[in-house]
């Protein structure tokens, strides 16, 4: 398998690698990717689901029942549903967000793409995402999958991270640089 040591070195990366291997064997990479995107949205939008994944007070049985019900209501594919059960059984639901990111990286690499983690102060429009992908494609000479995150604390602009490279064009970064320069 063509995984980087960085992904395999982390706990979430090992889970993502295992899920990716199963999805590839079952020719279900696209279905699992879609299910994981639904779960990512649920983590972002639902306080209850986020608490379920992070609370140490939830028992294994309760967590397994809750993720099964959540998977059914979100229309999650069977492989991802079983995987959620494994995470719940092993008390690793707190790793779900990182597993989703790692799986996205593995999936993009499988398609011959590079993944760019993009942080913006406000949600980007489809047109902005398309323009960003086109610009990154010309810079990198390959297709780019974009993993979007919204963080109002950057005030404006973008932070783009591709592998170990980071381009920080945020207003927060510019203001910090200006403050340091003014201190002299």
UniProtKB/Swiss-Prot annotation:
Keywords: ATP synthesis, Cell inner membrane, Cell membrane, CF(1), Hydrogen ion transport, Ion transport, Membrane, Transport
Membrane topology: Peripheral membrane protein
TM region(s), chain numbering: none
Keyword Nucleotidyltransferase recorded: no
Primary location class: membrane
Localisation per UniProt entry: Cell inner membrane
InterPro entries, alphabetized: ATP_synth_OSCP/delta_N_sf, ATPase_OSCP/d_CS, ATPase_OSCP/dsu
Superkingdom of origin: Bacteria
GO cellular component: plasma membrane; proton-transporting ATP synthase complex
GO molecular function, one term: proton-transporting ATP synthase activity, rotational mechanism
Family of this protein: Belongs to the ATPase delta chain family.
Function: F(1)F(0) ATP synthase produces ATP from ADP in the presence of a proton or sodium gradient. F-type ATPases consist of two structural domains, F(1) containing the extramembraneous catalytic core and F(0) containing the membrane proton channel, linked together by a central stalk and a peripheral stalk. During catalysis, ATP synthesis in the catalytic domain of F(1) is coupled via a rotary mechanism of the central stalk subunits to proton translocation. This protein is part of the stalk that links CF(0) to CF(1). It either transmits conformational changes from CF(0) to CF(1) or is implicated in proton conduction.
NCBIfam families in UniProt: ATP_synt_delta, PRK05758.2-2, PRK05758.3-2
Subunit details: F-type ATPases have 2 components, F(1) - the catalytic core - and F(0) - the membrane proton channel. F(1) has five subunits: alpha(3), beta(3), gamma(1), delta(1), epsilon(1). F(0) has three main subunits: a(1), b(2) and c(10-14). The alpha and beta chains form an alternating ring which encloses part of the gamma chain. F(1) is attached to F(0) by a central stalk formed by the gamma and epsilon chains, while a peripheral stalk is formed by the delta and b chains.
Protein name in the entry: ATP synthase subunit delta
Protein's organism: Rhizorhabdus wittichii (strain DSM 6014 / CCUG 31198 / JCM 15750 / NBRC 105917 / EY 4224 / RW1)
């Amino acid at each position: 398998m063509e995984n980087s040591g960085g992904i395999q070195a982390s706990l979430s990366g090992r889970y993502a690698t295992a899920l990716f291997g199963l999805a590839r064997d079952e020719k279900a990479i696209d279905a699992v990717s879609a299910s994981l995107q639904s779960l990512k949205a649920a983590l972002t939008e639902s306080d209850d689901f986020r608490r379920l994944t992070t609370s140490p007070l939830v028992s294994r049985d309760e967590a397994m029942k809750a993720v099964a019900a959540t998977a059914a209501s979100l229309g999650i594919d069977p492989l991802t549903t079983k995987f959620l059960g494994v995470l719940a059984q092993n008390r690793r639901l707190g790793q779900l967000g990182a597993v989703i990111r790692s799986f996205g990286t593995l999936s993009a690499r499988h398609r011959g793409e590079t993944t760019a983690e993009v942080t913006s102060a406000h949600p980007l429009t489809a047109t902005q995402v398309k323009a960003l992908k086109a610009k990154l494609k010309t810079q990198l000479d390959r297709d780019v999958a974009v993993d979007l995150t919204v963080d109002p604390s950057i005030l404006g602009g973008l932070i783009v991270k591709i592998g170990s490279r980071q381009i920080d064009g945020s207003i927060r970064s510019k203001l910090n640089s200006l403050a340091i320069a003014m201190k002299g």
